[in-house]
């Protein structure tokens, strides 16, 4: 009886936590949908729609060029040949879902130049309306985080979903980095 009473008391006390727990618990009888690959190499997924994919490297090692190849692949209705995406298999974006590119490091002029390279790689002459490349170097860390959070929500609703989000320079968003 005491055990039941305590269980009820804690259940009432932590009702909000209990609701969150239920939503987080794995239901083995109802498996989740399989994650869809967005970035792969030789058929092996590196980045999926519901996970993070991180590219690291020293200054001047070509990270922005690599990011440009990923973005180029995400801009078209059909998959680009791997020669244009540096050997990566990038899932095409036939529905025109949002492709968001936030850069915290490059100057506005450099980001403009990089975007031009991305468009040429994708064989495009103009930025698709669902693609948003945003230069955040001039903003404070707090403002960058707010802008990213709110714009992702805005663009998700505007374009019917998000295909890809790239944050180039994510370390600049971390207080202790």
Where do the language-model regions lie?
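Long, basic/Gly/Ser/Thr-rich N-terminal segments
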Residues: 1-8
């Amino acid at each position: 009886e005491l055990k039941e009473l305590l269980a009820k008391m804690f259940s009432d006390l932590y009702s909000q936590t209990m609701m969150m727990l239920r939503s987080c618990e794995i239901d083995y009888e109802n498996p989740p949908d399989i994650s869809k690959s967005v970035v792969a190499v030789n058929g092996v997924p590196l980045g999926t729609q519901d996970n993070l994919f991180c590219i690291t490297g020293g200054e001047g090692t070509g990270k922005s060029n690599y990011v440009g190849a990923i973005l180029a692949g995400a801009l078209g209705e059909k998959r680009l040949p791997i020669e244009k995406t540096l050997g990566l298999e990038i899932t095409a974006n036939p529905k025109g879902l949002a492709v968001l590119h936030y850069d915290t490091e490059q100057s506005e002029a450099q980001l403009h130049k990089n975007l031009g390279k991305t468009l040429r790689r994708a064989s495009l002459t103009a930025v698709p309306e669902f693609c948003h490349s945003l230069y955040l170097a001039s903003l404070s860390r707090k403002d960058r985080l707010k802008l990213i959070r709110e714009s992702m929500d805005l663009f998700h609703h505007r374009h019917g979903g998000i295909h890809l989000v790239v944050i180039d320079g994510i370390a600049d968003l971390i207080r202790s980095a």
